């Protein structure tokens, strides 16, 4: 009877050790997979999917089941990873996965198309008597434009932030006339079979012309006072193509895997290329202000400062020509922040990206994120009007990385390493 009890005890101890080893093997394999995927995405490595085999080992820890009972499940990933799993006749725990080590993943590559949602927030702030900012948020541009325009077979969206100075007339004019200024061009009435490089080039040309026409329209004193002007930051999304155009010191910042990517440059004296451009044209700064009066080096309006020749070529350092950045969105691009200088005067691009990303992880609402970021700028003592637009390119926020911790004795670790090395 004693012998029987001792045998049962030894069997139970052996079974317990086997369960522990099995669990450690599972964790070890999954750790290898995570590290390999992390290395792949961080280094942009590409491998032939035909040579790849990845398995996900799932265990069922139940005393009623055989401890060697593993479930091998194929998993899908966007890129290819190769993991070698050793097999040995002396390691029965791995016998069940040895035959699966040549499993090939069928890689389903689909073109990323953003699922767009947005939110905005605006506040005149504690130090300004009037609100001079305006903004636009259109998540479904095709529906907004109506039947007279070509309905693109991909999502279209349009956003703008306009920071007025010398009054709100100029920023209000751009907002109220944005659809006719930016989308009356023939490029939006044609039917392109594909959004290719030729179409995108025509789109950029059309956008530059829209900025020029908007500036010329405000030359008329009956529309806008000559002492009034505005910055203009716009973002146009067509499928997975993003185009950002900027005149002035509003800023657009893209979040790519948590990192801030500036999609525009501040047109002001602190931006060295702009300072050189102004000075090369005979302009000068008093402190950080153009002619001691204007905080920006590019703007729409401000005709009391601009001088034009009869041919329409600008002779003034103050111009309305936008900087335009284009890019193709991927799964790594999470959201875009657009804000006036009242935001960027008190925080960096990375600060804003981290702040919004944390908000999206908490509640997933871009409207609430825009409000929280705007209020954060006010909390940091912004002295200007504050306007924020947050555009999400995915319906779900980036998940936080799970961290699994477990402790293994030196003896168990050594035995596991010996077993894995065969």
Curated annotation (Swiss-Prot):
Mn(2+) 1 binds at residues 163-164. Gene3D superfamilies: PPM-type phosphatase domain (3.60.40.10). InterPro entries: PP2C, PP2C_BS, PPM-type-like_dom_sf, PPM-type_phosphatase-like_dom. Its cofactor is Mg(2+); Mn(2+). Residues 117-393 form the PPM-type phosphatase domain. Belongs to the PP2C family. This is Probable protein phosphatase 2C 43. It comes from Arabidopsis thaliana. The lineage of its organism: Eukaryota, Viridiplantae, Streptophyta, Embryophyta, Tracheophyta.
């Amino acid at each position: 009877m004693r012998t029987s009890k001792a045998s049962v005890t030894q069997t139970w101890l052996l079974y317990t050790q086997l369960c522990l080893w099995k669990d450690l093997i599972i964790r070890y394999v999954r750790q290898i997979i995570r590290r390999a995927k992390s290395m792949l995405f961080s280094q942009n490595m590409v491998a032939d999917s035909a040579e790849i085999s990845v398995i996900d080992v799932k265990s069922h820890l139940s005393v009623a089941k055989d401890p060697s009972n593993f479930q091998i499940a194929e998993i899908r990933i966007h890129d290819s990873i190769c993991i070698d799993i050793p097999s040995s006749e002396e390691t029965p725990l791995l016998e069940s996965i040895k035959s699966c080590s040549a499993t090939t993943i069928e890689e389903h590559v689909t073109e990323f198309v953003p699922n767009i949602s947005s939110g905005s927030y605006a506040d005149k702030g504690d130090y300004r008597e009037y609100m001079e900012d305006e903004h636009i948020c259109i998540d479904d541009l095709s529906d907004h434009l109506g039947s007279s325009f070509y309905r693109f077979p991909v999502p279209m969206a349009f956003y703008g932030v306009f920071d007025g100075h010398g009054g709100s007339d100029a920023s209000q004019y751009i907002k109220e006339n944005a659809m006719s200024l930016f989308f009356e061009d023939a490029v939006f009435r044609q039917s392109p079979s594909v959004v290719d490089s030729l179409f995108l080039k025509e789109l950029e040309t059309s956008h530059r012309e829209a900025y020029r026409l908007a500036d010329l329209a405000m030359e008329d004193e009956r529309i806008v006072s000559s002492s009034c002007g505005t910055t203009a930051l716009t973002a146009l999304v067509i499928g997975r193509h993003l185009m950002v155009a900027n005149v002035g010191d509003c800023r657009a910042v893209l979040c790519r895997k948590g990192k801030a990517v500036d999609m525009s440059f501040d047109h002001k004296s602190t931006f060295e290329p702009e300072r050189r451009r102004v000075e090369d044209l005979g302009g000068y700064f008093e402190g950080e202000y153009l002619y001691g009066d204007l905080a920006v080096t590019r703007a729409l309006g401000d005709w009391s400062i601009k001088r034009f020749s009869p041919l329409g070529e600008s002779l003034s350092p103050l111009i309305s020509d936008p900087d335009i950045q284009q890019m193709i969105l991927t799964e790594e691009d999470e959201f875009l922040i657009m804000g006036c200088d009242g935001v960027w005067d008190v925080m960096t691009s990375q600060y804003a990206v981290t702040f919004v990303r944390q908000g999206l992880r908490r509640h997933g609402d871009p409207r609430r994120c825009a409000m929280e970021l705007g209020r954060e700028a006010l909390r940091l003592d912004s002295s200007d009007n504050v306007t924020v637009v947050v555009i999400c390119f995915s319906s779900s926020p980036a998940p936080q990385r799970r961290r699994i911790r477990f402790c293994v004795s030196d003896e168990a670790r050594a035995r596991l390493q010996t077993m894995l090395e065969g």
